[in-house]
Structure formats: structure tokens, C-alpha cells
Regions:
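Extreme N-terminal, non-catalytic leader segments
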Residues: 1-22
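Hydrophobic/aromatic beta-strand patches that form the interior of the parallel beta-sheet core
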Residues: 23, 52-54, 99-104, 116-120
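Glycine-rich phosphate-binding P-loop
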Residues: 23-42
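Short beta-strand-centered segment that lines the nucleotide-binding/catalytic pocket of NTP-utilizing
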Residues: 41-60
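Conserved nucleotide-cofactor-binding alpha/beta core module
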Residues: 59-70
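ATP-dependent NMP and nucleoside kinases share a basic, alpha-helical "lid"
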Residues: 69-114
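C-terminal functional extensions of proteins
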Residues: 110-143
Length: 143
């Protein structure tokens, strides 16, 4: 398991050690978000957490709240829900749903500055964490 996911799992557990914790994983490519969320879920499981997974293809916030978030929050037991999907998962109105958020990207995709962590996934087997250093933006950002 890549150290990047272990480190992010450790960070989540340091910040939110118990209770019902919600993690959103999003990016331009929703399928890549699914893989990233699966890998993060595996790291959280390896760290001794009970993990639940959900994925949304369209990021419909109302459906996500009604069908996934509200039922999860109804039971406050110690576990982590990792939800993956398109950029809408971390939209301005949806950001408050998550205790922690991950924006995955590849190539010159633009970073999402409101995410808790940015993970570069040019090679999903070798992810690495990026930090929002706006002095070093990719060319596609217009820098």
C-alpha cells in the first residue's frame, strides 16, 4: 500500500479519532476518484477503522445528502464513510458535508484549493501528495 494513502489516513485519524467521520474524494475524473477512495479506504481499514464506501457518478448533492449522508449520520458509531465522485462532491455548497476532503488530479489538471489534501495520480499505483503552492501551478492554470 502506498505511503501517501497511509499518511493521509493517519492525518484523518489524528484530526478525527472517533465517531462517524465523512471523507469526500473528488476530481475531474470520477472513475479515478473511485480508485483513490478505494485505496484510501484500504489504508483506513489497515489502520483499524471500519470503513464504508459510496460513489456518486453525477455528484447530485440532494441525493447524496438524502441517500448516503443522512443515514450514515443517524448512527454515530466509530466508522468512516468515504464517498467518491466528480467535482460536485466538493462544490461550494457540499464542502461542509465532509470532515476531510481529497482532490485527486493527474497531469496538468487544476488543483482544488479547498480540499484538505491534493493527491497526484498520474500513476495510481504511485500516488504522491501535492501542496497548494500557487508559485508552482501547472501551466494549464495560466501560470
Amino acid at each position: 500500500m502506498p505511503e501517501t494513502w497511509k499518511d493521509i489516513a493517519a492525518e484523518i485519524l489524528h484530526l478525527y479519532p472517533s465517531g462517524a467521520r465523512l471523507v469526500g474524494v473528488a476530481g475531474v475524473d470520477a472513475a479515478r476518484s473511485r480508485r483513490a477512495a478505494d485505496d484510501l479506504g484500504a489504508a483506513l481499514t489497515a489502520a483499524g477503522q471500519t470503513v464504508e464506501r459510496a460513489h456518486t457518478d453525477d455528484g447530485d448533492e440532494d441525493a447524496l445528502r438524502a441517500d448516503v449522508i443522512t443515514p450514515f449520520r443517524a448512527d454515530r458509531s466509530d466508522r468512516v464513510l468515504v464517498v467518491s465522485g466528480p467535482p460536485a462532491v466538493l462544490s461550494t455548497s457540499a464542502r461542509g458535508l465532509w470532515n476531510y476532503s481529497v482532490w485527486q488530479l493527474a497531469g496538468d489538471e487544476k488543483p482544488h484549493t479547498a480540499a484538505s489534501a491534493l493527491v497526484q495520480l498520474d500513476d495510481p499505483d504511485r500516488p504522491f501528495r501535492r501542496f497548494a503552492d500557487f508559485c508552482a501551478l501547472p501551466a494549464s492554470f495560466g501560470a
